[in-house]
Amino acid sequence: MLPKKEEIRDKVVLVGLNSPVLREDSATEESMDELSALVETAGGETAGIVLQNRATPDPRTFIGEGKVAEVQLYVENVGATMVIFDNDLSPSQQRVLTELLGVQVLDRCGLILDIFAQRAKTKEGRLQVELAQYRYLLPRLIGMWSHLERQGGTSGKGPIGSKGPGETQLETDRRLINKKIDKIRADLEEVRRVRATQRQQRQKNEIPVVAIVGYTNAGKSTLLNQLTGAAIPANNRLFDTLDTTSRLLTVSDTMDVVVSDTVGFIRKLPHQLVEAFKATLEELEYADLLLHVIDVSNPEWQHQAEVVEKLIVELGANEIPRIDVFNKCDRVEAGDLRPHGADICSISARTGEGVDRLLEMIDRRLDKGTRRVTIHLPYDKGGLLDMLYREAKVESVEYSETIDIVAVCPPKVLGQIGDYTPDWTPPKEDWE
C-alpha cells in the first residue's frame, strides 16, 4: 500500500520594508513574526525572512533592484514557491516583482483576504469576503491581461492601435466585476435591513447588547463559550472567527443580555475588509457595552490594544461604555502584570477564573433599574397582564384573590404597576 500523500504546503519567503515614510505600514520584527503566523494560518510555511531598512520605497520594485536580486537568490536557494510582503504593494509593483522573482507575489492584504476566504462560513461572511476580494482584484486586472495586450491579440499580428482580445477581455472583466460588486452590495444592504429589524426588536424588548471585540486570537470565542455555554470553535489560530455569533446570556436574576462575538482585529487590517465587513462591524455602534478582550500574556498586548482602540474609533463606537478584559491571566507568572480597576477585569476565559467578577461588572454597567417584583393585580386590571407579557419578563402567574405575578420589569413598566407592587418603592427622583 502506498504511503498517504502528504499535503503540499507553499514554502514562503517573507519580505518587509522598514521606512519612516511608510509610518504604520512599515515592517518591524514583530509585524514579520505576525506575518509568519498568518502564513501558517493560511496553510503555508515560512522558509525565510528578509527585513530591509530603506529611506523610501522604490516606485517600481518597492525594495530596489539590488534587494530584488538578493531575494530572488534566496527564493532559489530555499526552493520557495511564493514571496509575501508585509507591506501593501501597488498593482504595478506586485506585477513587476512577480515577473522579476519568478514566483507568485502577494502582499499582506492579499494574504489576509485569502485567510478570510478560507474561514468565512455563513452566507453573510462569504459575501463580505467576496466583496473585499473583488475590490482588491479590480485594480490588478491589467497585469493579468498584459501578456495578451503585448501580443496585440492571440495572433500577435494586430495593427498598431488595434483593439486586441486582451484589451477586450480586460474591459469585459472590469464590467463583470463591477456588476458583481453592485450585486453583493445590494445583498449586504438587505443584511443591514434585517439586522436593523433585529436591533429594533431587541430595543423594544429592552434587551441590552454586549459586543466582544479584540485583537485576533485574544480569546473572544473562548470567552463567549465560557459565558454562555456555547460551542463556538475556539482554536489557537489567527482569524478563527469571521462570522458574528450572538447568544443570550443571563447576567443576573434581573438581567438578560445578547452577547455577540465579532471578527478579530489585526494591525494593518486591509481597508477593503473594514469596508466590506461594515454590515457586521456596525453592530458595535449599537451595542450597549463593549468587552475589549486583551491577551495579557502576549508581549505585544499594549500595541495590540492600541490597534483595536483605533479601529473602534474608526467604526464610530468609541463613546460606548467599555470594560477592558485582560484575558489569559493564568499564563502570567505570579507578580507579573494583572491590572485591576473600575473598568478592568482580569480573567482566564479558558479556566473561568475571574468570570464571575466580569458578570458582576456587566450587571452594574447595564443596570437601568430593572427589578424582579411580585405584582398583585385586581381582576378588573387584568388587561395589565397583557402589557406585562409584551414589555416585561413574566416568570409565574397564579390566580387567587388577585392575579399574583412574578416578573422582571424595566422602569417604565414598574411605573405603570407600582400601585400593585408592595415590595417595590420608586426611586427618590420619581417622588413628588
PLM segments and residue spans:
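Conserved nucleotide-binding/hydrolysis micro-motifs of P-loop NTPases
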Residues: 18-22, 54-56, 88-91, 110-113, ...
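Long, well-ordered amphipathic alpha-helical subdomains in the mid-to-C-terminal portions
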Residues: 366-413, 431
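N-terminal accessory targeting/assembly segments
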Residues: 1-113, 425-426, 430-432
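Conserved G1/Walker A P-loop phosphate-binding module
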Residues: 4-10, 149-289
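Canonical P-loop GTPase G-domain recognition
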Residues: 100-158, 165, 318-324, 328-379, ...
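Conserved C-terminal guanine-recognition region of P-loop GTPase G domains, centered on the G4
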Residues: 30-41, 72-77, 87-103, 253-256, ...
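Flexible beta-alpha connector loops of hexameric P-loop NTPases
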Residues: 21-27, 57-61, 119-124, 169, ...
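Conserved beta-strand segments of the P-loop GTPase G domain that flank and frequently precede/overlap
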Residues: 14-18, 49-52, 84-86, 292-295, ...
